[in-house]
UniProtKB/Swiss-Prot annotation:
Residues spanning the membrane: 2-22, 32-52, 55-75
Keyword Membrane applies: yes
Keywords, sorted A to Z: Cell membrane, Membrane, Transmembrane, Transmembrane helix
Membrane topology, from the record: Multi-pass membrane protein
Principal location listed in the UniProt entry: membrane
InterPro entries on file: DUF2545
Protein name: Uncharacterized protein YfdY
Cleavable signal peptide: none
Subcellular location per the Swiss-Prot or TrEMBL entry: Cell membrane
Pfam families in UniProt: DUF2545 (PF10810)
Lineage summary: Bacteria, Pseudomonadati, Pseudomonadota, Gammaproteobacteria, Enterobacterales
A GO CC annotation given for this chain: plasma membrane
The keyword Electron transport is annotated on this UniProt entry: no
Length: 80
């Protein structure tokens, strides 16, 4: 499970860095915190839903960077 956590943290940092290059630093910081909160919510919800199955929970947590990237660009392109 620690490997999933490390890879998830790397994904969130990389997505935030990409958003920072494309939009600006404020967007990168806000998307970082949004993805961390989303990953925590997904973790607790899927742990409750699957009865503690960590593999399924770890796989579902990778929705956080993908959703964070999509949401950030939808909001970001609306401002330009």
């Amino acid at each position: 499970m620690i490997n999933l956590w490390m890879f998830l943290a790397l994904c969130i940092v990389c997505v935030s860095g990409y958003i920072g290059q494309v939009l600006n630093v404020v967007s990168a910081v806000s998307s970082f915190f949004g993805m961390v909160i989303l990953a925590a919510l997904i973790y607790y919800f899927t742990m409750w839903l699957t009865g503690g199955n960590e593999l399924v929970t770890g796989i579902f947590m990778f929705l956080a960077p993908a959703c964070g990237l999509m949401i950030r660009f939808m909001v970001g392109y609306g401002r330009r």
